[in-house]
Each structure stands twice: as structure tokens, then as C-alpha cells.
């Protein structure tokens, strides 16, 4: 198997609304066109996939998950899990939230993968797929089944199968058939999952969730299926795990207390174990060391995904906010380590697939044979139900035939031997003619017999044909039908190919036409755009020409009049002073030019005029850029929107004094000058009106864009909700229709049974009448007897008792008959009830279909509405682009406007000083507002700087704590290294001493006599051993000092974690220092500017020569600042409240959808239960119909008694099983007890078996081998310990010494513990012999070992089965037979006994 690394993807979520409102900085960003990511200033990480803040769900799925789905279909296991801190977008990415409240474009990985899987299934019709789904939650280190909430946590266990794969025992796996079924189960599990609200996340996942899709694939072989032959096909079972991990949490940030705090502890411990596993697998130096999978349950579940046999993708979700810098850095480090983990993917093909297929085919054939055999037996039993003696005779004849066949086989064997012997004898011995003739006749007769034996008898052949006839006819009939269907299919395929060709041709034509239409539409749009621009320019030019010509005509008419009237002393001038904007123009131009209405004026003035000012165009472009930025980011965050009312008020304030100045200036100059001034002012006024209309146009476009986008989101939510409800309604309608079919079927069965029981009702009525008549006659006789005076009192009393008994019996009979009659009437009324229920269900289905039609109509309406909104949004975007284009073109247009503007300025500077004064006042006002804004921004910067300083202090304190821990560990490491070095020096000194002693001893050995040489050599060997040991110690100490391994592995791991934490905190401190430095620099610059501006303010105020104004201005200035700051805070709170309201609305929508889903789910479960009830009713009705007149009450009572009896047996066998399991825990005691049993048996029987016992043992061995083969052919089998034990009792039952008549009557099937003990005591008191009872061999009494009474075979794996010896088998069967019943031979034994 090839090793491949797991794929790691990183996704950066956009800033949240709260983060944008509080001006959080972005500390994580991706590098475009690369797979790299930068955190802080210079920390770069490289991953397999990187997704920025603008990435979509579709992009993430197509890049990372789609290859995993294809691998799943190929037969590989796949896993995707999301990792990251809380609130980083893991659940959103995986798709584990509320499915119904999510629009189509925001669906996560799980819904998209489900659709892809079922699409792949539909594309492979030659493979039979079975899809199963499970949903498990790890909450507080406990497993919880989200699809079956009633399952106890103690029933869920993590185990490993035979292949080493991790499985969850006890989890519910639901088989699904469609996407709707899977989505419904996913929604049920998501609704049951633990979530909570913290300070960091409104919908924080409080548990780890694992959604598993199992795909079982079986290849089809149509040709082999046609011939009815066995065929081999591959079994592929693959799984896809979608893991949504809970996020790591900081208690200081989340603010969790109480239960949430306990959850945080469990979540962090599980994620710490996962991080340790990733570190151990990702570190190449620790690959051979232990991997701590068992530290947490989530790591045990992910064992196959991390370092196992699955294809894995890890999606790390990070937050770009600067407040989460350290968490994001740690997540990226873990993700970088995970890239070093290597898995070994393997195809999940079942190794026993061929064997299983062969067994399934054999089982199918055996079932068919069994059905045909049962049919023949049922026919024979119906035909011979009254001929029981004939059946016994048939059985006896069959036994005789079997014996005769055995004798015949023996005779054939003898004849064969004699034939061979006579052939040899004929060649070896000379015979006379007569003997040769007889021998030849015997040979010929033998040959004839052989031919007759080889040729089958016609009777046997007929029997074989009878047995194989129905199957053969069925196969032939099926083959004919199959050929007919194949011919029809071939004809249909020809037709379909023709239609496909026609369809392809039509599609190509449609595509060509669509392309042509698109080309025409593009050219049409371009032509319309050019035409519109030309029309607008023409209209503007025409309006300008009309205005100028009207003005010239007006001035030419007003020249002969007096100068006084023309300069503004008349009534028209006064009217123009009062209404300078529109009244003079309308009064003078009304007869010459067309004044458009408001709507027409809006259409005409929609574009920016050519003669706009540069500064106004600059402001216009700035607003356009702000609007486009807002439109790009409005799907992600809500931006702060500051009103421009002050600017509008300022512009209005500037316009009013200018108007006044113009109105006053009319009376100071002669007519010609007045005409020039009026003309220039008119152009300026029209210019301002056009500019005002442009701003209003932009604001209205912005507002309409926001409203349309909000409507679009609402429409998408409504569409998604309606689609979800339609899917649910479709499932409910289908289930209710199935229930109606079952009700109709039950009604038909009830009608047939009611017709059968109607006859019974009439019969019961007749019997009841007869019983009543007998009762009245008995009463009359009793009354007559009482009225008579009998002399014999005893006889009278006796007769009275007899009559009373008859009366009681008659009453009971009448009551029983009435009850039977009532039961029959109830059964007859069952069909009417079913009809009523069916009609109610049909009405309900009609109502659901009506709801479905309404939803479809609503879907169409919402779809049209969505299309309209999309078109409006596109139109608005096009208008915005046009306005920006015109604004950009207006910068360099028409220098005449600049000359005109310069002329106006020069004109205002020279003759009209009042206009300049008002303009200065407006400029001062603007300047004052700018100074206020500067101070506000400076205060805001100061607040942010204080927050950054506090955060830096917290990080520094945390770093100091980590440094203290690190210093302690380093000191300990230093002390340990010093101790090791001293130990090394001591060992080296001791080695030197030993070398000296060895050299001395070697000299002594050379010079010493032979007697002392032995002692000296022993001393030398001891010194050498000591030197070797010291050498090894010194080598180990040197190695530890060389590699620096002076601490324990746990302490080294802790030191490594501390170093990483300190590094992350240093990076965070560095980032904070940079941000603080930049803020301080900006504050210094702002302080300098502010001091200069304050000096300017003081100079200007001093120039006013009014001392009181200074104090007033300062008060006003502070008051304005405080008010603006309060306004800013209120706006911030308002927007936060709006976001909370929006989130609450989303929660309400999710809860409403969940409630609707649960209501439909409850209806679905109720329908399923009703369907199961109807199926049981059909079974009961069929049973009653087959019984042909038996009482319902009696049958139900028999069933209840049988159930009670079975419950008693089940309790007894469970208790026996528990006792045996307790005994099996002590293998030594069991071995000793078994040895004693064997000793007693050998002592009792002297170790010799008679021939009869040998025959019995051989038969039992055959029976045991068949039992073992049966067990080995199946995987595991449970023994039916209630009914099978009663039906298959062997003939070796224990009969007491008094004979079979003295057997005790049993009140229950299973003996009690007291009976077992008494039997055990009797068994120990009697010797084991075969001569105590005169009964035949099949009823020989055998003795039982008490502790083995009532043994229940334990469910074992095939690897634990073994073959039982003959002696052991005999003893076990004897022990089981002594209890009065037979049990399957138990093959359980301790491993130590093997």
C-alpha cells in the first residue's frame, strides 16, 4: 500500500459584524495565486489548499471534498474534519447546522456530498448500492446516538473489527434510499445535538459530532442471473466520516461558568489529546514511539483517519481578528504538523465475497427446494390428515426399505467379491464342462443384474421428475419471459437511440440559436447604451440652448424698460427676492420653453451635467467608491454608515446666503450688468440642482440596492424552507399512500374473514338459542323437583345438585357463546373501521397534496420575485457604473465651465463682498466640524490604544508565567545534566581504578603458582564484569548528555509545549507592539495637527476682540464633542442591537423550521407504526382464516401464555449464562473440576467402553461434526432456547430407577435451581454404570454433572470454536440429557485448556 500524506486546507473566515463595529484589525491574510498564508508581519505557512475570506462553499467543496467522494465510490474510506477555535466557522463549513434555514449557496460540505453520492449512484445502474447513515456525538467524553436518543450511553462502545477498523458497537444505522431521507436524518441529528451560547459564538457546538455514510456496493451479473447459475461479484464497503469538532475555548474570552465551564474542560482535553496525536504522527523523530490514541474518545474514533487506511482532508478554520492572534497561530502550527502525517489507503473489498456469494446462491436454492417440499408436504398432509395409522405404517415401511437397502448394499459387495474370486478361480483351477457352464450362467446373470442396477427404474425416474418438475417448469417459464423482455428491451433501446440522436441534434440547434441570440442581445444592449448616451447628450445640449435662447429673448425684451424696474424695484423683483429658486424662471420662461414635470425632470437629469466643478466631482467619486465597497461587502458584514446631513445642511446654508446676495445685488447695477449676473447665477443654480439630483440619485440607488438584497435573502430563505417542506410532504404522502394500501389489504382480508365468520355467528346464535332453551327446561325441571315431596331426602339433594350443575354449565355456555358472538361481530366490524380510517387518510393525503400544490405555487411566485429582484439589482449596479463612468469623464470636460467658475469667483471677489462673507462663514463652519471630527477620531484612537495596551499586558503576564515554568524545567534540566556529569566522572574514575587493578592482577597471575591462579582468575573475571557494567553505564550517561535527554519524556513534551506557547505569545506581543507603535505615531501626528489647529482657532477668536466668545466657544466645542461621542456610542449600540435582533430572528426561523420538521417526523413515525400494526393485523387475520373457526380469545390467550412461558425460560437461561460466565472467569477451578469429572467417569466405567457405547459415540461424533460445520458455515448463531429445546429432545433422556412412569410432572419448561441441585446430589450419590436399569439402549439412564445443567451456548467468534473430543462430547450430551432436554453441544473452553 502506498503512503500518501493527508491533505490540509486552511479557510479564513471574514470579520464578524461585531468585529467590524469595534474596528478589529486583520492579522491573517492569504497571498493571491499561491497556497500560502501570512499571520502577523512575516510568519508564512504553506498548505495544500488556502481559501480567503471571499471563498464560497462551492469552491471549498469542489477543491477538497469532491475527490474524496469519488474515492468513496471507488471503495476507499474517507474522512473530512474541521479543526479550529470556537467561532471560526467549522460547523458552517461542514454543514452541520440547521439545514432548512440555509440558502442553496451557503450549504456546507455534508449536503453537497450527499447529492454527489446519490448522483454517482444513479450514474452506475450496473452496481447495487446500499446506503446506511449513522450520527454519533461525543459529549463530555460520552458517546451519544443522535438518531436513536433512547439508546443508553453504556450501550455504545468503541471496538476494532477483524480488519483493525474502528467501529461503534450499538449505534443505530439507518438504511436510506434518497437524498431526502439522508437530509431528514441529518436534520433530526442536528436538532438533538448539544449547542449553547457563549460570549464568542451564539451557536457554539458543545460536542464533537461524527456523521458517517456507509456505502455497500455489489456488482450485478445479468447473464449469470438469467441462467440461474451461481456468479461471483465483489463486495465493497466504504465509509465517509464527516467530523465537526468543537472549538478550543479560552474561559476568559467565552465567559463560561457552571455547566458550560465543565463542557469547556472536556472539549479542551479532547482537543489536547488530538493535538498530541497530530504532534506524535507529524514528528518524524517520534514515529516509532507510542501514539496516544486512547487518551480521548475522539482520537480513538479518528484512528483510521490519522495514520490509518483512510483518505483524509483536514480543514483548519481560523479567525482573521487580531484579538484571536495566538489561537490562530496555534491552529496553523497544528495544521502544518498534520501535513507530515501519512496514511495508507486500501480498497475495502470483502475477502470472503466469493464464499458468501456461493453460500447465498446455495441458500436461495435450498429455500426454493424447501418451499416446494413444504408445499408437497402440506398437500400430502391435507390429503392424509385423517389417515394417521397409514402414516405410521409408511414410516415403518420406510425404515424397512432403508434396512433392505443396507442389506442390498451388503449383498452387492459380497457378489462383487465373489465375482472377482470366481474369475481368479476360473483361470487357476480346471473345471469340468458342467461347472464351467454353471459358472458362465452365473457370470451372465451377474452382468444382467449390473446392467439393471445401472439403468434407473422408471418409478425412480418418475419420482425424480416429480421432484424436479416444478422447478424445471418454473425455470423454463422464467427463461421465456426473460427472452421476451430482452427482445422488448432491444426494441426500446433502438427507439431510445433514435430519440437520443434526435435530441442531440435539437440540443445542438438550440445551442446555436442561443449563441446567436446572446450575440444579438449583446449588440442590442451596446446599441441601446450608445443611443441612450447620445440622447442624453442631445437633451442636455438642447436644454442648455433653450435656456440661453430664452434668457437672451427675455433680456432683449427687458432692455427698453426703465433701469429701476429692470434692476429689481418692481413687483417681479420682489417676487424673485421671496422665491429666488423657481418663481422668476417660471414666470418669465413659461411662454417660451417647456418646463418638465418632476418625473420627466428626474429622467432628464439622471446623468451628471458636463459643466460640473472639479471639487464636486471629487466628492462624487469618493461617494461612488464608498458605495461600491459597501455593495461588495454587504453580504459579509454591516458597515458603519454615518449620515451626511451636516454636509447637506452646510450646502443648503451655503446656497441660501448666495441667493440672498444675488437678490440684493439686483438693485445696485444697471440693466446690462444685472442680466449678466442673473445669467451666471442661473447657470450656477442649475449646476447645483443637477449635483443635488446626482447625490440623491446615488443615495436612492444605494437604499434600493440594500432593500433589494434584503428582499433577495428573504426570498431565498422562503424558497429553501418551501423546498424542504415539499420534500417532507412528499415523504409523508408516500408513506400515507402505503398505509392506505395496507388498510385496503387489511379490509379485504377482514371482509373475507367476516364472510367466514358470519356463518359462525349464525351458528353461534343457534347454539345460544339451544342453550337458552336447555337452561329454561332445566329450571322448569328444578322447580318441579322442588315442588314435589320426595320421601328420600338424599335423592332429592342429589338431583338438585345435578340440576344446579347443569344450570351453571348452561349459563357458562351461554356466556361463552355470547362472548364469541361479540368477538365475531367485532371482527366483522373491522373492515368497516378500516374503510373509515382509509377514507380519513385519503382526506389527509388530499390535504397534504393541496399543501404541496400551494407550496409549488408559492415557489413559482418566489422564483419570479427572485428573478425580478436579481434584475433590479443588476439594473442598479449598471446605473452605478454609468454614474461612476460619467463622474470620471467629468474631470477633464469643458474648460469653459472652469473659466465660467473663475469669472464668477472674480466677480464675487470684486463687486459683491457680502457673498464672500457668507462663504467665509460656511468655510469656518466646515473647518470647525472637521476639528471636532479630528478630536473624536483622536479619542477613539486613544481608547483603542488603551485596549491594545491592556491586551499586551495580559499577554506579557501570561508569557512571564510560561517563562517561569520554562525556567524551572531548564533549571531541573541543568541540575540533571550536572548530576549526570558527576556520575560520569565517578564512573570514569572507577574505571581507571579497575584498569589498574586488572593490570596488577594480570601481573600477579603470571607470577603466582597454579593454586592461586584460580582465585586470581575469578577475581579478574569479576573485575572485568564490573568494568563492562560501568562501561555500559558511562556510555548511557554520555549518550544522554550528548543528546540532551536528561528529563523524562513527559517533561520534555511539556518543555516543548512551553517553548511553542512562548513563541506564539512573543509573536502576539510583537504584533501588538507594532500596532501600538503605529497608533502612537498617528496620535503624535494628530496631536501636532490639533495643537496647530487650536492655535489657529485662538488666533481667529482673538481677532474677533470679544473675550466672552472664547469661553462660549470652548464650552460649545466640548459640548459638541461629548454629544458626537454619545451619538457614536449610541449608533454603535443600535447597530449591535440590530445584529442581535437579526440573529434572534434567524434563531426563531431555525426553531420554526425544526418544529415543523419534528411535527412531520412525528407524523411519519405514527404512519410507520400504523403500517406495522396493519401488517400484524393481516398476519392475525390470515392466521384466523387458516384456523377455520377457532376462537380469537382462546388463540390470544394461548399466545399470551406462550409468551409468559418464553419470558420465564429467557430469565432462567440468562441467569444460567451469567453463572457460567462467572465460573469461566476462574480457569484453574474449571480445569480442576473437569479433571475430577473425568476421573469419576473413568473410575465408574473402568476406562472400557462396550460396543454399544462405541456405536453411540460414533453417531454422536457424526452429529457433533455436523453441528460444528453448521456453526462454521455461518458467522455466528444464537440458539433458540425455548421452542427448539422442546422439539428436538433426544432419546437419551434420564429415566429414574423406578421406571418411566415415575417421571415428575413439570410445571415449566426450565427446571429451577433447587431441582438442579437435587439432581446433582443424586448424581454424585450414584455410581456411573450401565446395568442399573432394564430399559433398552435408547432409554439407558445416564448421570449428569450438576454444574453443567441447563448450559446455554455462548455466542462466540469462529476463531474461538474448536472440535470436541469423543469422551467430552459423550459426557456433555449425557449431562444435558439428564436434565430432560437436549442442548446444542457447547464448544466454549478457556484458552488455557487448549
Swiss-Prot record:
Entry keyword annotation includes Phosphoprotein: yes
Compartment list: Cytoplasm, Cytoskeleton; Cell projection, Cilium
Gene3D superfamilies the record matches: Kinesin motor domain
GO terms, molecular function: ATP binding; microtubule binding; microtubule motor activity
BP GO annotations: cilium assembly; epithelial cilium movement involved in extracellular fluid movement; establishment of localization in cell; ventricular system development
Positions of the UniProt region annotated as Disordered: 559-582, 642-665, 886-916, 1267-1319, 1325-1344
Keyword Nucleotide-binding on entry: yes
Domain Kinesin motor, residue spans: 5-341
Top-level taxonomic group: Eukaryota
Compositional bias of kind Basic and acidic residues: 571-580, 1267-1280
Modified residues (Phosphoserine): 643, 646, 672, 675, 704, 999, 1365, 1387
Coiled-coil region list: 352-418, 498-554, 709-891, 921-1078, 1118-1152, 1186-1226
CDD domains per record: KISc_KIF4
Chief place where the protein resides: cytoplasm
Compositional bias per record (Polar residues), positions renumbered to this chain: 1281-1295, 1309-1319
Keywords: ATP-binding, Cell projection, Cilium, Cilium biogenesis/degradation, Coiled coil, Cytoplasm, Cytoskeleton, Microtubule, Motor protein, Nucleotide-binding, Phosphoprotein
Sequence positions that bind ATP: 84-91
Entries under PROSITE patterns matching the protein: KINESIN_MOTOR_1 (PS00411), KINESIN_MOTOR_2 (PS50067)
Family that this chain belongs to: Belongs to the TRAFAC class myosin-kinesin ATPase superfamily. Kinesin family. KIF27 subfamily.
Entry function: Plays an essential role in motile ciliogenesis.
Protein name (Swiss-Prot/TrEMBL): Kinesin-like protein KIF27
Amino acid at each position: 500500500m502506498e503512503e500518501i500524506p493527508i491533505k490540509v486546507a486552511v479557510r479564513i473566515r471574514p470579520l464578524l459584524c461585531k468585529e467590524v463595529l469595534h474596528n478589529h484589525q486583520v492579522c491573517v491574510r492569504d497571498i493571491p495565486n499561491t497556497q500560502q498564508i501570512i499571520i502577523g508581519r512575516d510568519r508564512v505557512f504553506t498548505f495544500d489548499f488556502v481559501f480567503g475570506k471571499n471563498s464560497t462553499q462551492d469552491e471549498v467543496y469542489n477543491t477538497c471534498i469532491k475527490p474524496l467522494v469519488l474515492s468513496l465510490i471507488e471503495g476507499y474510506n474517507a474522512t473530512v474534519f474541521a479543526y479550529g477555535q470556537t467561532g471560526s466557522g467549522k460547523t458552517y463549513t461542514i454543514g452541520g447546522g440547521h439545514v432548512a434555514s440555509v440558502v442553496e449557496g451557503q450549504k456546507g460540505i455534508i449536503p453537497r456530498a450527499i447529492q454527489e453520492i446519490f448522483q454517482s449512484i444513479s450514474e452506475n445502474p450496473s452496481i447495487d448500492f446500499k446506503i446506511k447513515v449513522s450520527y454519533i456525538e461525543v459529549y463530555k467524553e460520552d458517546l451519544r446516538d443522535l438518531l436513536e436518543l433512547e439508546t443508553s450511553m453504556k450501550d455504545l462502545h468503541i471496538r476494532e473489527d477483524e480488519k483493525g477498523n474502528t467501529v461503534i458497537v450499538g449505534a443505530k444505522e439507518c438504511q436510506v434510499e434518497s437524498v431526502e431521507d439522508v437530509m431528514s436524518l441529518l436534520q433530526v441529528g442536528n436538532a438533538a445535538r448539544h449547542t449553547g451560547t457563549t460570549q464568542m459564538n451564539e451557536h457554539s457546538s458543545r460536542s464533537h459530532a461524527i456523521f458517517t455514510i456507509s456505502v455497500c456496493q455489489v456488482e450485478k451479473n445479468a447473464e449469470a442471473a438469467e441462467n440461474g447459475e451461481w456468479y461471483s461479484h465483489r463486495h465493497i464497503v466504504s465509509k465517509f466520516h464527516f467530523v465537526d469538532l468543537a472549538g478550543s475555548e479560552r474561559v476568559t474570552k467565552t465567559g463560561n461558568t457552571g455547566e458550560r465551564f465543565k463542557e469547556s474542560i472536556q472539549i479542551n482535553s479532547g482537543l489536547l489529546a488530538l493535538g498530541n496525536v497530530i504532534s506524535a504522527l507529524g514528528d518524524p523523530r517520534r514515529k516509532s514511539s507510542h501514539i496516544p490514541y486512547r487518551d480521548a474518545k475522539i482520537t480513538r474514533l479518528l484512528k483510521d483517519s490519522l495514520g490509518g487506511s483512510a483518505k483524509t482532508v483536514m480543514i483548519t478554520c481560523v479567525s482573521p481578528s487580531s484579538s484571536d492572534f495566538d489561537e490562530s497561530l496555534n491552529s496553523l502550527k497544528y495544521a502544518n504538523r498534520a501535513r507530515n502525517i501519512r496514511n495508507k489507503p486500501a480498497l475495502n473489498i470483502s475477502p470472503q465475497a466469493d464464499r458468501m456469494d456461493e453460500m447465498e446462491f446455495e441458500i436461495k436454492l435450498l429455500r426454493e427446494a424447501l418451499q416446494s417440499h413444504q408445499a408437497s408436504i402440506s398437500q400430502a398432509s391435507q390429503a392424509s390428515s385423517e389417515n394417521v395409522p397409514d402414516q405410521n405404517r409408511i414410516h415403518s415401511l420406510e425404515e424397512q426399505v432403508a434396512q433392505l437397502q443396507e442389506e442390498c448394499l451388503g449383498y452387492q459387495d459380497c457378489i462383487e467379491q465373489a465375482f472377482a474370486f470366481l474369475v481368479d478361480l476360473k483361470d487357476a483351477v480346471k473345471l469340468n464342462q458342467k461347472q464351467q457352464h454353471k459358472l458362465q450362467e452365473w457370470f451372465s446373470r451377474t452382468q444382467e443384474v449390473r446392467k439393471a442396477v445401472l439403468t434407473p427404474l422408471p418409478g425412480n425416474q418418475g419420482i425424480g421428475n416429480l421432484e424436479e418438475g416444478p422447478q424445471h417448469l418454473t425455470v423454463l417459464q422464467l427463461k421465456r419471459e426473460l427472452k421476451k423482455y430482452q427482445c422488448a428491451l432491444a426494441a426500446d433501446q433502438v427507439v431510445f437511440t433514435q430519440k437520443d440522436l434526435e435530441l442531440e441534434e435539437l440540443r445542438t440547434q438550440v445551442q446555436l440559436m442561443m449563441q446567436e441570440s446572446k450575440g444579438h442581445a449583446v449588440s442590442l444592449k451596446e446599441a441601446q447604451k450608445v443611443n441612450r448616451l447620445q440622447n442624453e447628450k442631445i437633451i442636455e445640449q438642447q436644454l442648455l440652448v433653450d435656456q440661453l435662447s430664452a434668457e437672451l429673448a427675455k433680456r432683449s425684451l427687458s432692455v427698453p424698460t426703465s433701469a429701476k424696474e429692470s434692476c429689481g424695484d418692481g413687483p417681479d423683483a420682489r417676487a424673485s427676492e421671496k422665491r429666488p429658486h423657481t418663481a422668476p424662471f417660471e414666470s418669465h420662461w413659461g411662454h417660451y420653453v417647456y418646463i418638465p414635470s418632476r418625473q420627466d425632470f428626474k429622467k432628464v437629469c439622471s446623468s451628471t451635467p458636463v459643466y460640473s466643478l472639479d471639487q464636486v466631482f471629487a466628492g462624487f467619486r469618493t461617494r461612488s467608491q464608498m458605495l461600491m465597497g459597501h455593495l461588495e461587502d454587504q453580504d459579509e458584514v454591516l458597515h458603519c454608515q454615518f449620515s451626511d446631513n451636516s454636509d447637506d445642511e452646510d450646502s443648503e446654508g451655503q446656497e441660501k446666503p448666495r441667493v440672498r446676495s444675488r437678490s440684493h445685488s439686483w438693485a445696485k447695477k444697471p440693466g446690462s450688468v444685472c442680466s449678466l449676473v442673473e445669467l451666471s447665477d442661473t447657470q450656477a443654480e442649475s449646476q447645483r440642482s443637477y449635483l443635488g439630483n446626482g447625490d440623491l440619485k446615488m443615495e436612492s440607488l444605494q437604499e434600493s440596492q440594500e432593500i433589494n438584497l434584503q428582499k433577495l435573502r428573504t426570498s431565498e430563505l422562503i424558497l429553501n424552507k418551501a423546498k424542504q417542506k415539499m420534500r417532507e410532504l412528499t415523504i409523508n404522502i408516500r408513506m400515507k399512500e402505503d398505509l392506505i394500501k395496507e388498510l385496503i389489504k387489511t379490509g379485504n382480508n377482514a371482509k373475507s374473514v367476516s364472510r367466514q365468520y358470519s356463518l359462525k355467528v349464525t351458528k353461534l346464535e343457534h347454539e345460544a338459542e339451544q342453550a337458552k332453551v336447555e337452561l329454561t327446561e332445566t329450571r322448569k325441571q328444578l322447580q318441579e323437583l322442588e315442588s314435589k315431596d320426595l320421601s328420600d331426602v338424599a335423592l332429592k339433594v342429589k338431583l338438585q345438585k345435578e340440576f344446579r350443575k347443569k344450570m351453571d354449565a348452561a349459563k357458562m355456555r351461554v356466556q361463552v357463546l355470547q362472548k364469541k358472538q361479540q368477538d365475531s361481530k367485532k371482527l366483522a366490524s373491522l373492515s368497516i373501521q378500516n374503510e373509515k380510517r382509509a377514507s380519513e387518510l385519503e382526506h389527509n393525503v388530499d390535504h397534504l397534496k393541496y399543501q404541496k400544490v400551494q407550496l409549488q405555487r408559492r415557489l413559482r411566485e418566489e422564483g419570479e420575485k427572485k428573478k425580478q429582484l436579481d434584475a433590479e439589482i443588476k439594473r442598479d449596479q449598471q446605473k452605478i457604473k454609468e454614474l461612476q463612468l460619467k463622474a470620471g469623464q467629468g474631470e477633464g470636460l469643458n474648460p469653459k465651465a472652469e473659466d465660467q467658475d473663475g469669472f464668477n469667483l472674480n466677480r464675487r471677489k470684486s463687486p459683491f463682498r457680502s457673498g464672500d462673507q457668507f462663504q467665509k462663514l460656511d468655510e469656518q463652519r466646515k473647518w470647525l466640524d472637521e476639528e471636532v471630527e479630528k478630536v473624536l477620531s483622536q479619542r477613539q484612537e486613544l481608547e483603542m490604544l488603551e485596549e491594545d495596551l491592556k491586551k499586551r499586558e495580559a499577554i506579557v503576564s501570561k508569557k512571564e508565567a510560561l517563562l517561569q515554568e520554562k525556567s524551572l524545567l531548564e533549571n531541573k534540566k541543568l541540575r540533571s545534566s550536572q548530576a549526570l556529569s558527576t556520575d560520569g566522572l565517578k564512573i570514569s574514575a572507577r574505571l581507571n581504578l579497575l584498569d589498574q587493578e586488572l593490570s596488577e592482577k594480570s601481573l600477579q597471575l603470571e607470577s603466582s603458582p597454579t593454586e592461586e591462579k584460580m582465585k586470581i582468575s575469578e577475581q579478574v573475571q569479576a573485575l572485568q564484569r564490573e568494568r563492562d557494567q560501568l562501561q555500559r553505564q558511562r556510555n548511557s550517561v554520555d549518550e544522554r548528555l550528548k543528546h540532551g535527554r536528561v528529563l523524562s519524556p513527559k517533561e520534555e513534551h511539556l518543555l516543548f509545549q512551553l517553548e511553542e506557547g512562548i513563541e506564539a505569545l512573543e509573536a502576539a506581543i510583537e504584533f501588538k507592539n507594532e500596532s501600538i507603535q503605529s497608533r502612537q505615531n498617528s496620535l503624535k501626528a494628530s496631536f501636532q495637527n490639533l495643537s496647530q489647529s487650536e492655535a489657529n482657532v485662538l488666533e481667529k477668536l482673538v481677532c474677533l476682540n470679544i473675550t466672552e466668545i472664547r469661553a462660549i466657544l470652548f464650552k460649545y466645542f466640548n459640548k459638541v464633542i461629548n454629544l458626537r461621542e454619545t451619538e457614536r456610542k449610541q449608533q454603535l449600540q443600535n447597530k449591535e442591537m440590530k445584529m442581535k435582533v437579526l440573529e434572534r430572528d434567524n434563531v426563531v426561523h431555525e426553531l420554526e423550521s425544526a418544529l415543523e420538521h419534528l411535527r412531520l417526523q412525528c407524523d411519519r413515525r405514527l404512519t410507520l407504526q400504523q403500517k406495522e400494526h396493519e401488517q400484524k393485523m393481516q398476519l392475525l387475520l390470515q392466521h384466523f382464516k387458516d384456523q377455520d373457526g377457532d376462537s380469537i380469545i382462546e388463540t390470544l390467550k394461548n399466545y399470551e401464555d406462550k409468551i409468559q412461558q418464553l419470558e420465564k425460560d429467557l430469565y432462567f437461561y440468562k441467569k444460567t449464562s451469567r453463572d457460567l460466565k462467572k465460573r469461566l472467569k476462574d480457569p484453574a477451578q474449571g480445569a480442576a473440576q473437569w479433571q475430577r469429572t473425568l476421573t469419576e467417569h473413568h473410575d465408574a466405567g473402568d476406562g472400557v467402553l462396550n460396543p454399544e457405547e462405541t456405536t453411540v459415540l460414533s453417531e454422536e461424533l457424526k452429529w457433533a461434526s455436523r453441528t460444528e460445520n453448521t456453526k462454521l458455515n455461518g458467522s455466528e448463531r444464537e440458539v433458540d432456547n425455548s421452542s427448539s429445546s422442546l422439539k428436538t429432545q433426544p432419546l437419551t433422556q434420564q429415566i429414574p430407577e423406578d421406571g418411566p412412569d415415575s417421571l415428575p410432572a413439570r410445571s415449566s419448561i426450565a427446571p429451577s435451581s433447587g431441582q438442579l441441585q437435587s439432581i446433582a446430589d443424586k448424581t454424585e450419590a450414584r455410581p456411573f454404570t450401565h446395568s442399573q436399569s432394564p430399559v433398552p439402549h435408547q432409554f439407558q439412564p445416564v448421570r449428569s454433572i450438576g454444574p453443567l445443567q441447563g448450559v446455554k451456548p455462548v455466542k462466540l467468534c469462529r476463531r474461538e470454536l474448536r472440535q470436541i473430543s469423543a469422551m467430552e462430547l459423550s459426557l456433555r450430551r449425557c449431562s444435558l440429557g439428564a436434565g430432560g432436554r437436549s442442548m446444542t453441544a457447547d464448544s466454549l473452553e478457556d484458552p488455557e485448556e487448549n
